[in-house]
Every structure is written in structure tokens, then in C-alpha cells.
Amino acid sequence: MSLRRRTLLKVIVLGDSGVGKTSLMNQYVHKKFSQQYKATIGADFVTKELQIDDRLVTLQIWDTAGQERFQSLGVAFYRGADCCVLVYDVNVMKSFDTLENWHEEFLKQANPPDPRAFPFILLGNKIDIDGGNSRVVSEKKAKDWCAAKGNIPYFETSAKEDYNVDAAFLCIAKAALANEHEQDIYFQGIPEAAVPENEQRSGCAC
């Protein structure tokens, strides 16, 4: 029997309350979207398995509260992260303006060995609202911010319409895999069928 490698990757999703962090995660993992908004209290996580090349990857995606009073919980949740996903609402300028704070807070609390090399990914969510007519943060403005942070990847997404969600999280998985802390578990003889068909590599390059 051959040995297959399964890797656990910890991904932290940050951003203001109401930008759609939970909705993006639910769309990616469960293929579900709800119009009802319920604020995340503290932090919670979901998992998703996928295959990248010869690696069986388990993404542990942490959904953290956007409210300021819960930010002190960050230390325990940020530590050991392999990738940080920053999310803002393209229709709310304040959610974009606070990205700098989220970025700095993560680096401060997570304290990665090389902050400049740690993988971040930016998602501009809710591009479906009002057919895009109500957006206030331009794509150029977002890309300029990413360029200033070392050319971090940027995706425009819609959790409601399931637009770019899979592509974004595949890029997230690849970035996290490149930064992994070698938390590998070996399983003997895991068949290909163990990875659900809809979670196979899509072929999208990050």
C-alpha cells in the first residue's frame, strides 16, 4: 500500500462584521447561502478536504467575530495559522479602510517568523449587490492596496451567487500549503475515492 499525505492547514478569515465572512465559508464548504444575517460570536471553524497535486489537504477555516469587543480573543486563534484571508464589502468603504488594522493586528497577534513572507489573500465580497452599482471601492483601489502589501492575491467574490468562491479558496489552500508548518499525518492506502469528486482539484492556478 502506498502512503498518502494528509496535511492540516489553518486558515484565519478576518474582516469587519457583516462583510460576508461566514457566508463565504458556508458557500465554499456547504454550497449554501442564507439571506439571514447572524453575527459570529467569538470564533468558530469549518473544515473542507481537497486534493492539490499529490497532497490530501484539510483546510481548517476559522471564522472570527468582526466586532471590536471580540478582537482580544485573537491571540489563541491566530497562532499557528498558515494563511490569513482579509475580507471587505465592496459597497462599504469603512470595511476597506479597516483592512490595515486587521492586517496589523494579525501580524502582531500571530507573530509569524517572517511577517513579510506570510501569505495573505484579499477578498472583495458582495459584488452582486445592486448589480454592482452601489460599490464604492474600485477594483483598482483594492489592487493598489494589495500591491503595497507585497502583491498579495486579490479576488472579487459573491457568496450569494457563488462567484469566484472556489477559485479564491483554492488559491488560499495553495498559499497555506506553501507556508505549512509540516503538520502532516500519514494514512496508509487512502483511495482516490476518499476525496469527494466535487472537491478534486479544479485546475485553477493561483
Curated annotation (Swiss-Prot):
A lipid is attached at C204, C206 (S-geranylgeranyl cysteine). It is found in: Cell membrane. It comes from the Eukaryota. Pfam families: Ras (PF00071). GO terms for cellular component: plasma membrane; vacuolar membrane. Protein transport. Probably involved in vesicular traffic. This is Ras-related protein Rab7. It comes from Glycine max. The lineage of its organism: Eukaryota, Viridiplantae, Streptophyta, Embryophyta, Tracheophyta.
